[in-house]
């Protein structure tokens, strides 16, 4: 009898686990749909889409825009800053007005999650709609984020030329692609409906990205973590960074980053929903979903500033697919095996003729 019961449990357990994951996947899709509704409500009210990063990104108290910096460690309470995420912009349209009212946009945006942060009360919050229930890497939940807006598109660029020219937002990389990115959302200058000749239904707006593993620096990185690009340069071409990180083999390094999208326990810094950057709320379509390569930064493994470019791919723990929110509000499951050219084209506002044929919708 015991053996029979054990066999029945063995048969039923996978079915139960599958049903639970199916429910989590549906909830993940619903979260993205809610984000999509908020984005469209924002556009209807403002006549443009949310900015993933405001200008100036970093200026001193006199208003002088800083050109050179590699992180926000030196930001003081009196600085002028603009690295507020698209997530922050849509909060009022997600019935989160209470949190919005707590954010002091006229004071410096700070990533250190202590009482000295101007917005600590607002950011010391968990927003369930920003958390994928299947994401096993979620930690304390507070300020954490599983969903990212598509800024880079088919480029690895973050919105500025490099970490020494953070105030240069126009121009092209060595591959001719715009340093402002070609995704649905553009740092510093908002996109509008007229900027989508391919149509909203053919352009990815948001997707999911597994949070960092939260491991210690003495451990190997997982696919959820970021590394510094081997042979890094300040402004790599798309294929250069893709090839450099495609064949990477995990190694212990102080330059690995384990806290993407997270506020790890014991850490005073958050990389969650309030903040701009590839370390927190932005992604691109340079690499396919759940790719076998390693996400990486070209100048730093913590690509939080606009001049720190990166491959930040869509990733999930749903199996062999990711959920993608398109500009018309539709949410589609995209398989890992999607053709890379198609995936990159779906990440752009205006693909070349024929690029979006054979797509996923």
Where are these regions (language model features)?
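Alpha-helical hydrophobic helix detector
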Residues: 2-15
């Amino acid at each position: 009898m015991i053996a029979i019961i054990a066999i029945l449990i063995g048969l039923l357990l996978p079915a139960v686990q599958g049903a639970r994951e199916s429910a989590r996947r549906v909830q993940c899709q619903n979260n993205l749909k809610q984000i999509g509704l908020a984005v469209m409500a924002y556009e209807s009210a403002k006549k443009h889409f949310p900015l993933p990063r405001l200008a100036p990104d970093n200026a001193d108290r006199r208003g002088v825009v800083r050109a050179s910096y590699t992180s926000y460690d030196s930001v003081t309470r009196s600085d002028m800053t603009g690295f507020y995420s698209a997530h922050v912009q849509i909060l009022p349209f997600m019935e989160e007005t209470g949190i919005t009212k707590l954010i002091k946009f006229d004071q410096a945006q700070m990533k250190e999650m202590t009482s000295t942060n101007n917005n600590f009360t607002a950011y010391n919050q968990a927003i369930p709609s920003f958390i994928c229930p299947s994401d096993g890497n979620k930690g304390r939940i507070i300020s954490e984020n599983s969903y990212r807006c598509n800024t880079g598109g088919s480029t690895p660029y973050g919105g500025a030329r490099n970490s020494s020219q953070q105030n240069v937002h126009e121009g092209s990389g060595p591959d001719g692609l715009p340093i402002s990115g070609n995704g649905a959302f553009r740092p510093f200058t908002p996109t509008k409906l007229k900027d989508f000749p391919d149509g909203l239904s053919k352009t990815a707006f948001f997707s999911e990205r597994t949070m960092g593993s939260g491991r210690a620096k003495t451990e190997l990185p997982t696919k959820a973590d970021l590394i510094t690009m081997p042979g890094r340069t300040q402004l790599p071409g798309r294929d250069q960074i893709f090839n450099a990180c495609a064949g990477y083999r995990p190694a212990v390094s102080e330059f690995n980053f384990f806290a993407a999208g997270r506020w790890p326990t014991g850490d005073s810094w958050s990389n969650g929903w309030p903040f701009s950057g590839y370390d927190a709320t932005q992604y691109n379509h340079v690499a396919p979903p759940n790719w076998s390569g390693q996400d990486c930064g070209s100048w730093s493994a913590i690509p939080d500033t606009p001049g720190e470019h990166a491959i930040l791919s869509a990733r999930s723990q749903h199996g062999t697919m990711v959920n993608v929110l398109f500009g018309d509000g539709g949410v589609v499951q995209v398989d890992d095996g999607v053709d890379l050219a198609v995936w990159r084209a779906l990440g752009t506002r205006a693909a070349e003729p024929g690029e979006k044929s054979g797509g996923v919708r």
